[in-house]
């Protein structure tokens, strides 16, 4: 089984695919993003869709493709090429999209009629798309993402504490995620205010840069930090490439998303690093965090109640250690990379034509 991969631009992924033997082609794939949700944007996407359709169709014929695999609902052209050539189509679904309603309905229709199987990254994602169009016989299967737990927790601790001049007496509570309305940076700051009033030694670290077009949110976040008098208490590190090193020094990891996050891999990375996790109770988080065993699930719209849930973890180091150990065991048992690979390969094999 050989793979030809189409990517929309040059970047580190090209080298990663080539390293494992895949052939890579750079093709503008008419990726559907929120910034194109306008009459002009839809015209732009339609033009690039037709170009991508032509290029991909030519490529599929040249390599005698047996199957098309699309790795996001934001790329529609793979489904069209597969349909036009009579090829099986596997669609990997990472998104929970509620609005615009017309887009959600169109994507739901496409999933029903333009793929042999959809692979949802979580049961929450599967439920969302199954419920979007009431019809029996779902084509969607759930396959959890996997990570190599052995790559986490091996970094030397102390790097972050040294960088921020924090002692072992400081409790580091951190979040990692790109800046966006629903990623919860502002909610994290409000939680920080509640916790810091009771535990002055707590420090709060935010890691992650902004999605393109959302850089203006930095102003809102830092204005809130100032208004709550948390300068020096909440520390924004921006983009970092050394996430495993940072996680090692976190005492508590927080996922404060205010909208359902399909399956946030960073939660698995924190658990693999033996960190207790606090996550808002919706989306894929509820399938990753076992409430009261590997961490706590909190509301996404009530920082007072969230603080009352989190406080025992802030207060009790032994509880944090117990949750962290249980979290790592859960990652190794349920979210292993080897299991993920095996399930994906099996699905693809099921839909490849049998050799004659």
Model-derived regions: residue spans:
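A conserved mid-protein helix/loop that constitutes part of the nucleotide-sugar donor-binding site
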Residues: 171, 175-197, 204, 304
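Short hydrophobic beta-strand element within catalytic cores of glycosyltransferases
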Residues: 276-279, 289
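A short helix/loop element that forms part of the nucleotide-sugar donor recognition site in Leloir-type
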Residues: 153-166, 221-223, 343
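Carbohydrate-associated surface elements
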Residues: 124, 146
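Conserved acidic donor-binding segment of nucleotide-sugar-dependent glycosyltransferases
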Residues: 291-292, 296-304, 312-318
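Short, structured helix-loop element that forms part of the nucleotide-activated donor/catalytic region
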Residues: 12-18, 205-231, 319
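A short, well-ordered alpha-helix in the C-terminal region of glycosyltransferases
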Residues: 159, 305, 312, 319-334, ...
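Active-site donor-binding acidic/aromatic loop of nucleotide-activated sugar
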Residues: 213-218, 231-240, 246, 296-297
């Amino acid at each position: 089984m050989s793979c030809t991969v189409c990517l929309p631009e040059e970047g580190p992924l090209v080298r990663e695919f080539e390293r494992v033997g895949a052939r890579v082609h750079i093709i503008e794939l008419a990726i559907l993003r929120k910034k194109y949700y306008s009459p002009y944007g839809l015209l732009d996407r339609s033009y690039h869709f037709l170009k991508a359709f032509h290029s991909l169709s030519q490529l599929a014929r040249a390599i005698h493709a047996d199957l098309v695999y699309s790795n996001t609902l934001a790329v529609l052209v793979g489904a069209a090429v597969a349909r036009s050539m009579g090829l099986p189509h596997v669609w990997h679904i990472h998104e929970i999209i509620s609005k615009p309603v017309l887009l959600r309905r169109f994507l739901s229709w496409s999933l029903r009629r333009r793929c042999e199987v959809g692979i949802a990254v979580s049961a929450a994602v599967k439920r969302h798309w199954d419920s979007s169009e009431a019809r029996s016989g779902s084509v969607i299967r759930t396959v959890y993402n996997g990570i190599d737990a052995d790559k986490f927790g091996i970094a030397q601790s102390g790097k972050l504490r040294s960088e921020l001049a924090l002692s072992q007496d400081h409790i580091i509570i951190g979040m990692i995620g790109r800046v966006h309305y629903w990623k919860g940076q502002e909610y994290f700051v409000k939680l920080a205010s509640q916790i810091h009033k009771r535990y002055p030694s707590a420090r709060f670290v935010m890691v992650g840069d902004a999605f393109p077009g959302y850089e203006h949110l930095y102003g809102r976040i830092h204005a809130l930090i100032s208004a709550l008098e948390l300068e020096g208490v909440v520390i924004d590190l921006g983009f970092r490439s050394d996430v495993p090193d940072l996680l090692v020094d976190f005492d508590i990891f927080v996922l404060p998303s205010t909208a359902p996050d399909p399956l946030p891999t960073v939660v698995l990375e924190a658990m693999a690093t033996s960190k207790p996790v606090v996550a808002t109770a919706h989306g894929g988080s509820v399938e990753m965090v076992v409430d009261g065993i590997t961490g706590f699930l909190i509301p996404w719209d009530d920082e007072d109640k969230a603080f009352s849930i989190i406080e025992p973890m802030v207060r009790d180091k032994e509880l944090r250690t117990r949750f962290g150990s249980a979290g790592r065991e859960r990652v190794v048992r349920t979210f292993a990379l080897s299991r993920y690979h095996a399930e994906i390969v099996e699905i693809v094999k099921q839909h490849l034509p049998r050799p004659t």
